[in-house]
Amino acid sequence: DDAVLDGWASQYGLENLSAEKFRPYLDGVADQLQIHINEAHEINACAHKVIQGCEKMQFSWKPAQRNVKQCALTGHCLAGCPSDRKMSSLVTHLPWAAAHGARIFSDTEVVRVLTRDGRARGVEARITDPDSGAHVADMQVDADMVVLAAGAIHTPLIMQRSQIEDRSGQLGRNLSIQPFTQVLGKFKEPLYGFRGALVGVQVDEFTRTDGFTIFSGLAEPESLLAQGDMKAGKAHIDFMKNYKYYAGVNAFSTDQGRGYVEWSGDAYSGDKTIHWNPNREEFNNMKASAALAARIFFSGGAEKVYMPTFQNLEVDSVFALDETLDKVDFGLKGMYTFRANSFSPHGTCRMGADPYQAVVAPTGQVY
């Protein structure tokens, strides 16, 4: 989104990340990763129910974009594409880097960055057995430049274990996760909504106004089971018998970046803390986005909607939705009500022109 890029440029002094300067690089990567707008055959029955609901509600929607090359429509996206058509790093950047001389070490975890005279001079790592998890060897790599790209969780942890100076006090802070919940709708006719492309369409009616974005997508049964959303005993059996009648969406909302990641203790024997819980405003945003998803399903003809709560709340009519949602309360720190997930934690090593507000300079160098 160009508005996001321009916001980074103006708010944090990151002129090189403005849409004018940075967009060409993003477009180049998009071409490399085969990112394209879903075509008609990539929009499955689950997505069509979302479309029907949006059309009736007069909500804006559009086909989603995916990084996939000639999708085989197998539906195993969450478990790894069986035909390697999803353009993940496993089939793109890693083999491309290897072809240009990069050496890749599997089962090897960077413990800390080695520094000398105020500069990063290499890394210290340990190698583990992939089956037993046992520590089998140590490794040291000397380098003129060290690039940390371990995501919003492990990048600050490595820096903290390395005792890198934190001038701004922001290292590991400002964790945002953009939480989402999965809402399921049950329909009269069989949909087999887990077949075909996982993500078909997105609802962008509320993206700019409220920060809500809703994507169609019903996980295959075993993937949903991993989230603990499929009940137990007889209830599980009944749920599975009806799985072909379900459609699903992921309802995203925004958060304020109040979480943190922290390492305590020795670099090898210490432990990490990942802390995030919603405040009441963020909690209400999660509830509102889930409610919109439910209304879309009812407008699309759903007989029942399953709300993403630990209470296993089921709604039989749009007229009962508000009453049901009144039962969803903040509870203990807002953490034990919704079954929330995150795909995109970020913010823990933020970049900026002010060394007292940011961890990383606009050049990518740590202050």
Predicted regions and their residues:
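Rossmann-like flavin
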Residues: 1-70, 277
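Generic recognition of stable, solvent-exposed alpha-helical segments in well-folded globular domains
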Residues: 3, 21-24, 45, 49, ...
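Generic, well-ordered alpha-helical scaffold segments in large soluble proteins
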Residues: 7, 25, 53, 57, ...
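Patatin-like phospholipase A catalytic core
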Residues: 42-67, 287-289, 295-324
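Helical element adjacent to the flavin cofactor pocket in flavoenzyme catalytic cores
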Residues: 53, 67, 72-144, 175
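A glycine-rich dinucleotide-binding beta-alpha-beta segment and adjacent secondary-structure elements
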Residues: 63-64, 73-77, 111-124, 302-367
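Glycine-rich loop(s) and the adjacent beta-strand/alpha-helix scaffold that form part
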Residues: 99, 108, 113, 124-201
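FAD cofactor-binding and catalytic pocket of flavoenzymes
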Residues: 168-297, 304, 328, 333-360, ...
